[in-house]
């Protein structure tokens, strides 16, 4: 694919008087994993709907697989696989039948569809569940089946909306391994997620959006360096405000969330020396991570 598989240019979308996507621009390169991050209500779901032609932008331009959207969205979707946030597998069919039935939407012959099933089941590690009904599968198995179904048409682009929500750690890591194998095969992936570790592990670049606007973009490690650029000490105690008054001189920046004081430090030694041996206090010294970036950009307060 010579052109950008996904391209947004100054896109806007309103619902009534509310501007939910506000001049959003980003472009995804061939073969990269690009993450959309943002708090609830930031406009991520609306962005995906517009990308797939399920909602029309009020301004700006969108292209998917080189096709203008929404005018050629149906044609573009023939080259796209989608993993929705919530599984929409058919509970009346077996694992094998879910794949076979879905292949009909792409006009495949029965012979071609049957030839696809075995390698897709192997990819999803569901070979032993081919004849099981969906209701017999664990949550992780259902997500892997949904991913396998998204690959029926051998898509150039995969769009994944929070693909590991609700999975236990083992199932999540297996899903990550499967996604990395797709990237190694040259697939292009657009992913939304609330798991910062997931974004940091999988994504080549990230776009952080808030209130429909892009507020940061870059590689995970670059964002961590530019937005934080130091270590973090988390201090747990009964009076974080008093602790901040006492310790802020030893930190580059401080934040409070609940009973936790976050101290961003260039040199941790002076601060940790004041904490050692103090009853009722616990602390953790760690490198900065993507969650620190996200919370610095969007705030630590809960957003609905």
UniProtKB/Swiss-Prot annotation:
SMART domains in the record: AAA
Keyword Phosphoprotein part of the UniProt annotation: no
Protein purpose: Part of the ABC transporter complex NodIJ involved in the export of the nodulation factors (Nod factors), the bacterial signal molecules that induce symbiosis and subsequent nodulation induction. Nod factors are LCO (lipo-chitin oligosaccharide), a modified beta-1,4-linked N-acetylglucosamine oligosaccharide. This subunit is responsible for energy coupling to the transport system.
GO molecular function: ATP binding; ATP hydrolysis activity; transmembrane transporter activity
Alphabetized SUPFAM superfamilies for the sequence: P-loop containing nucleoside triphosphate hydrolases
Enzyme Commission number(s) of this protein: 7.6.2.-
Keywords recorded for this protein, A-Z: ATP-binding, Cell inner membrane, Cell membrane, Membrane, Nodulation, Nucleotide-binding, Translocase, Transport
Membrane-protein topology: Peripheral membrane protein
Lineage: Bacteria, Pseudomonadati, Pseudomonadota, Betaproteobacteria, Burkholderiales
Predominant location category: membrane
Source organism: Burkholderia orbicola (strain AU 1054)
Record carries keyword Transport: yes
Subunit structure of this chain's protein: The complex is composed of two ATP-binding proteins (NodI) and two transmembrane proteins (NodJ).
Binding site for ATP: 38-45
The protein, known as: Nod factor export ATP-binding protein I
Compartments where found: Cell inner membrane
Gene name of this polypeptide: nodI
Domain (ABC transporter): residue spans on this chain: 6-236
Recorded GO CC terms: plasma membrane
Similarity comment text for this entry: Belongs to the ABC transporter superfamily. Lipooligosaccharide exporter (TC 3.A.1.102) family.
